[in-house]
Amino acid sequence: MTISVSVRQVVGPEDAARRNTQGLRDGFVIEALFQPGRANLTYSHLDRMIVGGVVPAADRLVIDRVAETGTQRFLDRREAAIINIGGSGTVSVGDKDHVLGFQEALYVGMGGGALGFASDDANAPALFYVLSAPAHRSCPTVHITRDMAKKLSLGSAEESNARTINQYVHPDVCESCQLLVGLTMFEPGSVWNTMPAHVHDRRMEVYLYFGMQEATRIFHFMGEPGETRHVVLKNHEAVLSPGWSIHSGAGTGRYAFIWAMAGDNMSFTDMDKVPMEALR
């Protein structure tokens, strides 16, 4: 099969503050995630999160052994969450098939076995976004629809940040070891995400931006509050966020994003808010 794995080392705040644009992208941005007929994985040393894009074309794709994990099988010591942001497709866990429509998710517990991916229509392929973190126990596999997700409305039109957070892998929806995963949608005219900003030193986070027109761009802000930087992202690009960094963005047009966290706790509200006067 066609699978690639890249490794990202940890970048500290002092190093990040000295980097130019390409240096920031090399350290934090994940490009070309979704390529037809390929499974592209990025192994980040931030809480050992694996971020992947799987696009089955005519042939089924399988993730079973990833040498970088040091285990016989990918899920021997890991859990995973998979969200489909493309056409309808099927994810196989061991010998059981799960059909995922657009914006439907599958949580797979530790020891679930090989993961198989197939598209219903190769001309409108599924786009499977894969997130995986180390696990210490097995939790049940759960198929999660958007209706099942816990809804949280935040922001306002006046602040240009009215949005709905759909919590997919969350203690109130789906048992997991440490993964937290959700999808944020915006009201028309709202462009800002995660502003006012915050940090959570106890957890890393990764954003995947999607649902964008070809010319739309996200100006994603990162860095320590007093040393902010930005990267410009297009559709289907992801960005890693260490615990010390803010993670906020504004779009030139409509967009959505998937967020995922791993770390010390599973409290979505455990964050250190950053006052506006602290941002530079």
UniProtKB/Swiss-Prot annotation:
- Pathway membership, UniProt: Glycan metabolism; pectin degradation; 2-dehydro-3-deoxy-D-gluconate from pectin: step 4/5
Q: Which InterPro entries match?
A: KduI, KduI/IolB_isomerase, KduI_N, RmlC-like_jellyroll, RmlC_Cupin_sf
**Cofactor requirements of the protein:** Zn(2+)
Catalytic activity annotation: 5-dehydro-4-deoxy-D-glucuronate = 3-deoxy-D-glycero-2,5-hexodiulosonate
Cofactor: record remark:
Binds 1 zinc ion per subunit.
> What is the residue range of the signal peptide feature?
none
One Pfam family it belongs to: KduI
Q: What is its EC number?
A: 5.3.1.17
The family line of this record is:
Belongs to the KduI family.
Its recorded name reads 4-deoxy-L-threo-5-hexosulose-uronate ketol-isomerase 1
Q: What is the lineage of its organism?
A: Bacteria, Pseudomonadati, Pseudomonadota, Alphaproteobacteria, Hyphomicrobiales
